[in-house]
A protein has these predicted regions:
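Acidic, surface-exposed loops and disordered segments
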Residues: 1-146
Length: 146
C-alpha cells in the first residue's frame, strides 16, 4: 500500500480483534517512532499488551479490544500539540500501510503511569489506539474545497 492509498484507506477504528501484532511490524513501528522522536523532539512510546487504558467508565467512545497504543508525549512547549499531530500522523499512516488500524484519542482513556514514562517537564497530549480492527472503519462526509 502506498502512502496515498493509506491516506484514502485510513479511518478511525474503535473496536479491535484479539490478534497479536507480529514482531516485524512492531520493529517497523519502533523504528519510525525513534525517527519521529529524534526529529520532532518528542517522547512517543508504543505500549503493548496493556488493557487498562481503554476500559471502565473513562473509556467513553465505545472502544473495545484495545491492548496496544501509542502515548504521545513531549516536553511542554507552545508547539507541542502541532508536533504531536504531525509526527503522530506519520506513524498512523505507516501503521495503515502495515495492515493495522488506529484511532486518535484525546480524552477517552485512563492514565496508566506504570505502562509508560512522562517526565516532570513533559505532557501526555493524547493516545492512539493501535491494532487489527474488527472493521476497516467508515469514511465520514468531508466538505469540498469550494
Amino acid at each position: 500500500m502506498t502512502l496515498l492509498e493509506a491516506i484514502s484507506a485510513r479511518h478511525s477504528v474503535r473496536k479491535y480483534l484479539d490478534k497479536e501484532i507480529p514482531a516485524d511490524i512492531i520493529a517497523a513501528l519502533q523504528d519510525k517512532i525513534m525517527e519521529c522522536n529524534k526529529i520532532g523532539h518528542l517522547n512517543i512510546q508504543l505500549v503493548q499488551n496493556e488493557t487498562k487504558a481503554f476500559t471502565g467508565m473513562l473509556s467513553y467512545g465505545s472502544f473495545s479490544g484495545v491492548k496496544n497504543y501509542l502515548v504521545m508525549v513531549g516536553k511542554k512547549a507552545k508547539d507541542l500539540d502541532e508536533r504531536v499531530g504531525y509526527y503522530g500522523e506519520q506513524i498512523v499512516l505507516l501503521a495503515q500501510t502495515l495492515g493495522l488500524n488506529t484511532c486518535w484519542v484525546g480524552l477517552s482513556y485512563r492514565k496508566v503511569p506504570e505502562a509508560y514514562n512522562v517526565g516532570k517537564d513533559e505532557k501526555l497530549v493524547c493516545m492512539i489506539a493501535l491494532g487489527y480492527g474488527e472493521t476497516q472503519g467508515v469514511p465520514h462526509k468531508i466538505k469540498t474545497v469550494e
